[in-house]
Amino acid sequence: MSEQNNTEMTFQIQRIYTKDISFEAPNAPHVFQKDWQPEVKLDLDTASSQLADDVYEVVLRVTVTASLGEETAFLCEVQQGGIFSIAGIEGTQMAHCLGAYCPNILFPYARECITSLVSRGTFPQLNLAPVNFDALFMNYLQQQAGEGTEEHQDA
């Protein structure tokens, strides 16, 4: 009889936490006197690291900048962290789990934190739309594949 690989995929959330919060309203209070027609910029970034065997930290950084013309109305940054137990997967599946699946779990927490900070700054309510981290991850893989192709063509 041949030996079978009985490694099952396991995924468990150990902890979700706020790692860092920053809110700045550098032009308050005079920014409150202006017409509220902001240009809102959303910036996302993820980072992951292995803490122990099958234990990973994933940090989602969400930065929102609202500007009125040349002036910054507010800048809000949240780093939402999570510790996850992940076993039984590797390679591209692990990269997808750390780069898309975990950020999908963390984003609602970061979004709620940003909404609360903006509200406490007495700015109009900010509703961030859901983010498709799976699509962002696929775009990232396509960019990496394109860069790899260009490197081989240059050689």
Curated annotation (Swiss-Prot):
MF terms (GO), sorted A to Z: unfolded protein binding
Main location: cytoplasm
Protein transport in keyword set: yes
Gene Ontology cellular component terms for the protein in this record: cytoplasm
Record key words, sorted: Chaperone, Cytoplasm, Protein transport, Translocation, Transport
Signal peptide: none
GO biological process terms, semicolon-separated: protein folding; protein tetramerization; protein transport
Domain of life per record: Bacteria
The keyword Zinc is assigned to this record: no
Compartments, record wording: Cytoplasm
Assigned protein family: Belongs to the SecB family.
Function summary: One of the proteins required for the normal export of preproteins out of the cell cytoplasm. It is a molecular chaperone that binds to a subset of precursor proteins, maintaining them in a translocation-competent state. It also specifically binds to its receptor SecA.
Oligomer status and interactors: Homotetramer, a dimer of dimers. One homotetramer interacts with 1 SecA dimer.
Descriptive protein name: Protein-export protein SecB
Organism of this sequence: Escherichia fergusonii (strain ATCC 35469 / DSM 13698 / CCUG 18766 / IAM 14443 / JCM 21226 / LMG 7866 / NBRC 102419 / NCTC 12128 / CDC 0568-73)
